[in-house]
Amino acid sequence: MQLFDTLRGHKATLEIPKDRPLTLYVCGVTPYDTTHIGHAHTFLIFDILIRYIRSQGGQVTYCQNVTDVDDPLFERANRDNIAWDVLAKREVDQYLKDCTAMNFLAPDFFPKVSEEISGMIPIIEGLLKNGKAYVANGNVFFDVSSEPSYGEMARLGGYEELLKTANKRGNNPNDPNKTDPLDFVLWRTSNPGEPTWPSPWGPGRPGWHIECTAMSTRYLGDQLDIHGGGRDLVFPHHPSEIVQTEGYTGKRPFTRFWVHGGLTWLDGAKMSKSLGNLVFVRDAVLQQSPDSIRWYLASFPYREDFNYIRADAKAAEGEIAALVTALSAPVGSGPVLDVNDDVTAFYAALDDDLAMHIALTHLKSIITRINAKSGTHSIRAAQQQLRACAGVIGFKAAE
């Protein structure tokens, strides 16, 4: 299939392996608050990608992590006067309930940072040995000057723009322990009241980026087929993963395809936990069917940002009602209904950079044609094709 690779900046051919499963790593949630529709959109993209690859005879090994050691989690736990691990468990449990409600495929591996820290130490030691990192007062930093290509994925136009963006996303440019303001943390001393783990550099905790390198390489190997997440990870998270993973393993590329979903907006602002302008999945599924939410989220080009409009999302209930009607419509004894053209176009759309929004137009056409001919035409084969196509999009109604 053709798939857009963020690092290359264009579509390229993704060869689906025949002798092994395709490996997919997706950056998961930081469990300090409940899953929102923006998260659901990101995970829907990869859910449909997996379903499509499997429909074409491929296999996928899927790893999605939980970032349960991170500043936002500790800050929220401190604010709410709750133990950080209790908060994390509560929100992970809710997240899994939301995933079940949305009919998301369960990952093959679901590692939590808090259970993987011992595996990060050897990687950091390797980066120090390879001259990619340095120690300063119990902290370890990656030396970005050792990798001139650092940040090229983001196409931000130069050092100052990289630094400005990194600063907005957790970087501390004024840390006196750093050689360069853009250098990022591999291991850090913990703040008072935060959890710590032992290390050769003293007690502390890992930096954000090294966590994903350790988990992805442990469960999927040193080189991945696809690495994904939301577009907000295009910098600094994913470029940091690239340089530290390749700096440790010596193998390039770390990932064949970088796939990023667009961000979800609400009332003119990016939907985010920090802003508090959220539509929680747990609330949305009480107001409408999960299938209708899935239809609505799949109706946008996956790489583009979109504005979530509650009324439009609710209107997708009509599409699901029509789907259910078509799947159970009475079969007539007249001519056979031929929907092969729409079925072919449906799969062709997904084959061309996972164009879910285009695939849905052909799915809707199949539904409309079946409902128009129910009771008069022989629609059994068309219904079977519809069920298969709807299954690729992941509709529970098709199961």
Language-model features, listed with the residues they occupy:
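Alpha-helical recognition segments enriched in aromatics with Gly/Pro capping
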Residues: M1-Y32, D47, S118-V331
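N-terminal, positively charged nucleic-acid-binding surface of large information/translation enzymes
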Residues: R8-T13, P17-N103
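Short coil/loop linkers at secondary-structure junctions
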Residues: Q59, A83, L105, Q223, ...
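Short, well-structured beta-strand/strand-turn elements
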Residues: Q59-T61, G131-N137, I370-N371
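Short catalytic-loop micro-motif centered on adjacent basic/acidic residues
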Residues: C63, P107-P111, H227-G229, R380
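N-terminal, positively charged, Ser/Thr/Ala/Gly-biased leader segments
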Residues: K97-A133
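Structural preference for alpha-helix termini/caps and helix-kink/transition segments
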Residues: K270-M271, N277-E399
